[in-house]
């Protein structure tokens, strides 16, 4: 059997979180449950992340909980490409088997009981995580590094491209406000608290 392996290597050293027990099969499929938010009936979001930005997504979950009382379920997505391949295969099968019970894609299966809007953040352009939009049935927001490349510290670059923990938190709060689950004043308060300039140029334009 001929097998081809590939590895994506990032230029950042950090301690990788421990793999959740029983997640091996889902990791291979491209999406796995990393950590569930707390229980309760308050606002809840689903946070998806991949690569080095997943650390910012984890930090955003803590900000949402501690600063705004919002619970976040965390999902690791090591392969959005694998997720869209699976989804398209399921779409094709459902198209060709109209008299049988429709199958669910891996994304749909993982999120079928999830509550709240879904926010995805990656170190790639937004189109990367946009690929799975047809399989996300809740409101879906994608964050990515669209724009011209430049040199600076990781912290400043992630702020510039609007993919750091504060921008992930803001996107989650805005999605909750759009869904009517929190007041829009909360989003405005987050802009002030995290010193996010509403007149900041779009990274695509500078």
Which residues fall in each region the model found?
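Thiamine diphosphate
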Residues: 1-206
